[in-house]
Amino acid sequence: MAATPRFRDDASATPHPDGAPETAPSDRKHPVDETLPPLKMFTSGLQHVAAMYAGVVAPPMIVGPAVGLTPKETAFLMGASLFTAGIATLLQTLGFWRIGARLPFVNGVSFAGVTPMVAIGKDRGHDGIAVIFGAIIVASLLGFVLAPYFCKLVRFFPPVVTGTVITLIGVSLLPVAFNWSQGGNATAHDYGSTTNITMAAVTLVIVLGLRKLLRGFLQQIAILLGLIIGTLIAIPVGITDFGAIKNADAIGFPTPFHFGAPQFEIAAIVSMSIVMLVCMTESTADMLALGKIVDRPADERTIEGGLRADTLGSAISPLFNGFMCSAFAQNIGLVAMTKVRSRFVVAAGGGILILLGLVPVAASVIALVPLPVLGGAGIVLFGSVAASGIQTLAGAALEKGENALIVAAAVGVGLIPIAAPDFYHAFPKDLLVVLDSGISTGCVVAIVLNLAFNHLGRKPESEEAGTAPGGHDPVKAMEVAAH
């Protein structure tokens, strides 16, 4: 078997605040720490922004009208969300002290908080937004304090759990791509039209063709090129909207406390704290997935830093009129597909997000990409995440019946919110924050069943089906599974 390349891991070679580096520098810089030439850095970063843009602006588009904001105020929320997503992404990728995973990890507005935020602020106007922001600040600070303890969950993520969760992340995202392919707005007259679906299919074929025909850097930005070509084709078809450019302001700094000082209500704080715990669970799973994809397995310190960046970014976000931030799983698929592992590329994407938040007219250019075009590319992106999970499960000893049963039950439970969205409609609304997340429920089921089948009542063995190959260290487990 060929020798594994040895990289100099800058993240671990840099002295930590509490002592010497954990590992000695290797022969050459790890791809995660490589910097690309400026043009490649910019275009690769722009590709990440294009992949996440719709996901960032969608929550404010939903919450703004629900709480009674005007279209102009909702547009202001969208710009603020781009700005704060950029700040959170820079915290995550570049980091400082023990904050930041220092992985190619994109942060943006969390969808998990949309339903609770609508419930908190419905028809309350500026007061509703102020209460939402106050709840996010308190919940985020609580998450920041809990991060050093929450990261201990990594020990409960051997390959059978990790692979299951990564697969669920990809499968859970695919309905988003399907919705985009149909047009994104279920109430629109052309939702699900043959035109929209055909455009999605054309974009999908273009992306796959570019990946097959191109080489080198052009192959790495096949998604971006596919989005550009798809958008150009969509113009004569008539599904590209230029209205956003005409109405956009040239400059739009997100003035702090634009909607007034944050207000603090106990019920709202409890609700958003639950959302924060859900986001932290999903971010932990995302970091484990990304760590495997980029060949830098996420250990407890990495996850602690990542969770601190998530929660700090979320605490800062309301100051600039943004919402709770968390990892964007769709960008993990982009890393898996392009093989561009540099965290500085994603940091460049964070810089672009900040620029878009400050220059609304530039943001409106990105918004030109029709959702059907984005949906066609999304099928490949999100499918790549699921494929990475399946690859991880290949090293999880599924021939041992307990592990196959764990995967079957966890995937089955995790797919409930996707296959039957109203399945939990009779449950209390506070529980729906957790139950409506297939990633969270599937993750919990996988962890509990792994403990029940592979640990309780058994003597610890390094090669047990549910334990990590090579011991109970999940990082070593993923290394063994990968080779």
Feature annotation, model-predicted:
Residues M1-S44, F242-F257, K292-R296, G306, ...:
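Intrinsically disordered, low-complexity non-transmembrane regions of multi-pass membrane transporters
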Residues T4-P5, S26, P31-T35, I206-G209, ...:
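Hydrophobic transmembrane alpha-helices of multi-pass solute/ion transporters
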Residues D18-G19, V56-P60, G64, T203-L213, ...:
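Juxtamembrane interface elements at the cytosolic ends of transmembrane helices
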Residues P38, G64-R102, S271-R343:
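Membrane-embedded helical hairpins/re-entrant loop segments and their flanking transmembrane helices
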Residues L39-V56, G192-L204, A222, P236-V237, ...:
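Hydrophobic, membrane-embedded alpha-helices of multi-pass small-molecule transporters
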Residues F76, R98-G113, R155-G163, L218-L224, ...:
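Short, non-helical or kinked segments that cap or interrupt transmembrane helices
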